[in-house]
């Protein structure tokens, strides 16, 4: 869905997001720019409960810039997990860094990144969190 960020942008583009969530087997949100859009997450979480869905997904880390470090990844994932996100979808993993992609942001979570081999620390944290967190 587009423009799910605020209630006013939803009204202009969708009418409302809640009815749309009913059609999804796994409702989801899109959290770009590292913003904390609590209303969007709470709406989706409410739809998950109302429609008896198994979880909620979120596309995250998009447009966060190249200096978005592990702390940012953990902080952004933690608040979303607290609001019911059970499936995290990384915004980008580039197959190549040729052309304009080398200036793309966020930094790709793929083998080109120097910290790629350390990234399982973040993913393991969220795997444990989702195992312990009630659905």
Outline where the language-model segments fall.
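Carbohydrate-binding surfaces of carbohydrate-active enzymes
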Residues: 1-135
């Amino acid at each position: 869905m587009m423009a799910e960020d605020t209630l006013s942008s939803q009204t202009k583009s969708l009418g409302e997001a809640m009815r749309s969530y009913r059609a999804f087997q796994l409702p989801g949100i899109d959290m770009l720019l590292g913003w904390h859009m609590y209303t969007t997450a709470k709406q989706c979480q409410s739809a998950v409960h109302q429609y008896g869905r198994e979880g909620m997904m979120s596309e995250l880390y998009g447009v966060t810039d190249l200096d978005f470090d592990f702390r940012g990844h953990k902080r952004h994932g933690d608040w979303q997990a607290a609001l019911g996100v059970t499936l995290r979808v990384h915004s980008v993993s580039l197959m190549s860094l040729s052309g304009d992609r080398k200036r793309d942001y966020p930094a790709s979570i793929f083998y080109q990144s120097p910290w790629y081999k350390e990234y399982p620390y973040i993913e393991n944290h969220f795997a444990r969190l989702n195992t312990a967190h009630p659905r």
